[in-house]
Amino acid sequence: MSISSVIKSLQDIMRKDAGVDGDAQRLGQLSWLLFLKIFDTQEEELELEQDDYQFPIPQRYLWRSWAANSEGITGDALLEFVNDDLFPTLKNLTAPIDKNPRGFVVKQAFSDAYNYMKNGTLLRQVINKLNEIDFSSSQERHLFGDIYEQILRDLQSAGNAGEFYTPRAVTRFMVNRIDPKLGESIMDPACGTGGFLACAFDHVKDNYVKTTEDHKTLQQQIYGVEKKQLPHLLCTTNMLLHGIEVPVQIRHDNTLNKPLSSWDEQVDVIVTNPPFGGTEEDGIEKNFPAEMQTRETADLFLQLIIEVLADKGRAAVVLPDGTLFGEGVKTKIKKLLTEECNLHTIVRLPNGVFNPYTGIKTNILFFTKGQPTKEVWFYEHPYPDGVKNYSKTKPMKFEEFQAEIDWWGNEADDFASREENNQAWKVGIDDIIARNFNLDIKNPYQGETISHDPDELLAQYQTQQAEIGELRNQLRDILGAALAGNKGAN
């Protein structure tokens, strides 16, 4: 049976269980099961490699001990074991990060995990179906990596916190252009399910890893932080799938939840798509300088990225149009960005890249810390011939970025080979300052075209609605700050 049909069968079985309500809970259920199965596959490999190997969790909780035998415990006995023994034990493991890092990973993964299934017989069917996938086979593991990404894409129900699955084509292009090297620290401060980190890991492995020592070095390079439990568990599983034995650097935390000035870390590479359109809970903004405080998540993350990048550190960040044209605190952040970093390229993405999750129009900002910006190159990414909008069934493809890759040039010579064309143009920093750091600069080589195509009109309408929502959030922030100021004055 193919892996994709195994996944479909899993979903069909879980739909029969009264305790599992909707795609998000199905994904949550599948996540902790997958985590334990993949974790135990790695345990078996580590046992073979090390003579006196010590298990990081009690042996009876390893997948092989209670789940691997298709004729093993089932029904109420299985439910009782999972709910009253397995979960309480793993949530309360004594596993210091320095002495038992793999145990620490398990404890973190299970900190807020939950068994939704109420029928032990159906749970046994799910477990037996999972056992049809052989994670010790590199071919099946690679295949499953692709399927895993598909699961994340299919099951994601985008909420109102602005978290959207980043299309693989966009992720690959960003990592390809940033080109992380062996030994460079690579971070995603809002890592979600780990798409950027997995892509960066694969990029370094495919281009720079030659020896076993290189592979060990690579395992230490990857850093991620995710504040929500389910994406954190999915990301940790994703890292295990990619061969990171001890993904302790994937933290279950809110990156913004400590004063900006207290960050000691200096990171070589940041690739991320921070949540946008959402706002942080009260008090988080107090971790930022008084004149730069806002509750808008994307603005706070951009400040954080500028702060934690090392000298000559490189970043690629997805940001909405609202960041480009926004005023107030957004203007101050863009001024800081151009003073502290060389914002050398902005790739303007077309409508629909994040369909069906949001119609907000987005951009990729590429910058390097240490030198101020002299000029910004813009590249307007066009739809391919015959495409009027992207959709879930017709997503963006990596090959579409070949034109940008061919045009890109080399940062070492200040991109001397770049030339303006119908899609690319540059704007000097003096012009940007004169525009009060409004970076929403239209392509001078493309005239305004009026379209009567219903698909395009619908896409434009969705974009406008999303931008109205973004402006509403900004206005709420400004009014909130003004009211808070008045209270302080009284």
UniProtKB/Swiss-Prot annotation:
Q: Name the EC number(s).
A: 2.1.1.72
- Annotated S-adenosyl-L-methionine binding lies at 163-168, 193-195, 226
Reaction(s) catalysed by this chain, per the record, are: a 2'-deoxyadenosine in DNA + S-adenosyl-L-methionine = an N(6)-methyl-2'-deoxyadenosine in DNA + S-adenosyl-L-homocysteine + H(+)
- Keywords for the protein's UniProt record, in alphabetical order: DNA-binding, Methyltransferase, Restriction system, S-adenosyl-L-methionine, Transferase
Task: Give the Gene Ontology MF terms in alphabetical order.
Answer: DNA binding; N-methyltransferase activity; site-specific DNA-methyltransferase (adenine-specific) activity
User: Which PANTHER family did the record assign?
Assistant: SLR6095 PROTEIN, TYPE I RESTRICTION ENZYME ECOKI METHYLASE SUBUNIT
What is the designated name of this protein?
Answer: Type I restriction enzyme EcoEI methylase subunit
Give the organism the record lists: Escherichia coli
Lineage of the species this protein comes from: Bacteria, Pseudomonadati, Pseudomonadota, Gammaproteobacteria, Enterobacterales
Q: Which gene encodes it?
A: hsdM
